[in-house]
């Protein structure tokens, strides 16, 4: 985790950001031209990470406690929360270590710091890949639940979901290890960018198709009850707005980071690109914000999960609560295949 002044890095190998200034404003590039640089205070960054950490821990605990949530749909949501938890946790850990090194509180050998840096980079990269994969997996699961509703439980069985989850985690760890090892190859960065674009296209295609089917279904109900067409148009507008918010948040939170990686490949020395590189920490902050928003979109919309979450919060102040909960606190146990929240 080598430092240059106040610079901090998520994937230190992938970040070619020049030394950052301590205050927001206009920084000068090599020609003296003004360059907008937004500074994110470490306290704000750590606070957002802590909010994400607590939020996703609650999601994992709620799903683990309630056997009614032990279905493939909620397993994917649980793994998304776990990967988001690791994203925020690894960023908080790296920031804390950097602050301790800068303050001279943490003194250790350079080789130990470098090994720690590499370990955190692998953890961060693998958790980011997992987060993207599980967002795609949730979209696929919801697509199957709508277009193959009668065969959903025979297609999306629990063993298949568990194998898919295991494959995602293993592939993400192996891929991130290779990415960090061969960070100086442009192909590595391009693979990450292509992977992000593939997930974006997959989610867009599936959710747009689901929205179209929902509109057709609503139109059929309207015709059946001889209602007026404007009601159908209103439903379509609400669905389109929900879809825009869903994909818009995903793109706005993840897009700048992968834009950064793209520019590192194609214009590492260009003055305009260097101005963008100076805002690398802003891009990381947007990813942390996404880990805060994910539970609001995918988890907390479920009434069953919200009810269990209240029980978890009550149990935190009642020591014997989990023990008295009977079989509900066992993981994974037998499950009731519950399809979960409807698509947006």
From Swiss-Prot:
- Glycosylation, residue list: 29
Q: Where in the cell is it found?
A: Cell membrane
Give residue ranges on the Extracellular side. Answer: 1-37, 94-118, 184-191, 267-279
Q: Which residues lie on this side of the membrane: Cytoplasmic?
A: 64-72, 141-163, 212-240, 301-344
- GO molecular function terms attached to this record: melanocyte-stimulating hormone receptor activity
Top-level taxon of the source organism: Eukaryota
Give membrane topology per the record. Answer: Multi-pass membrane protein
Where would you say this protein principally sits, based on its record? membrane
Q: Does the keyword Cell membrane apply?
A: yes
Question: What is this protein's function per UniProt?
Answer: Receptor for MSH (alpha, beta and gamma) and ACTH. The activity of this receptor is mediated by G proteins which activate adenylate cyclase. Mediates melanogenesis, the production of eumelanin (black/brown) and phaeomelanin (red/yellow), via regulation of cAMP signaling in melanocytes.
As for family, the record states: Belongs to the G-protein coupled receptor 1 family.
| Record's protein name | Melanocyte-stimulating hormone receptor
Natural source organism: Callithrix jacchus
Gene from which the chain derives: MC1R
């Amino acid at each position: 985790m080598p430092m240059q002044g106040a610079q901090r890095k998520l994937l230190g190998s992938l970040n070619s950001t020049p030394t950052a200034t301590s205050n927001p404003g206009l920084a000068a590039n090599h020609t003296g031209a003004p360059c907008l640089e937004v500074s994110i205070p470490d306290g704000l960054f750590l606070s957002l990470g802590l909010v994400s950490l607590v939020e996703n821990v609650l999601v994992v605990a709620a799903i683990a406690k309630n056997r009614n949530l032990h279905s493939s749909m909620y397993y994917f949501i649980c793994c998304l929360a776990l990967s988001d938890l690791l994203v925020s946790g690894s960023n908080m850990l790296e920031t804390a270590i950097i602050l301790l090194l800068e303050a001279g509180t943490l003194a250790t050998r350079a080789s130990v710091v470098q090994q720690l840096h590499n370990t955190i980079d692998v953890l961060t990269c693998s958790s980011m890949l997992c987060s993207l994969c599980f967002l795609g997996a949730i979209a696929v699961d919801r697509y199957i639940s709508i277009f193959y509703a009668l065969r959903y439980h025979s297609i999306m069985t629990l063993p298949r979901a568990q194998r898919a989850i295991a494959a995602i985690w293993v592939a993400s760890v192996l891929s991130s290890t290779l990415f960090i090892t061969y960070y100086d190859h442009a192909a590595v960065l391009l693979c990450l960018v292509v992977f992000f674009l593939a997930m974006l296209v997959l989610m867009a295609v599936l959710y747009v198709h689901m929205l179209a089917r929902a509109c057709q279904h609503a139109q059929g109900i309207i015709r059946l009850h001889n209602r007026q067409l404007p009601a159908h148009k209103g439903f379509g507008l609400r669905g389109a707005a929900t879809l825009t918010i869903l994909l818009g948040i995903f793109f706005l939170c993840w897009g700048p980071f992968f834009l950064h990686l793209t520019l590192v490949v194609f214009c590492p020395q260009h003055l305009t690109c260097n101005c963008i590189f100076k805002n690398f920490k802003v891009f990381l902050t947007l990813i942390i914000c996404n880990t805060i928003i994910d539970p609001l979109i995918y988890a907390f919309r479920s009434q069953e999960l919200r009810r269990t979450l209240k029980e978890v919060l009550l149990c935190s102040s009642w020591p014997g609560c989990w023990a008295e909960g009977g079989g509900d606190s066992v993981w994974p146990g037998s499950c009731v295949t519950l399809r979960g929240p409807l698509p947006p």
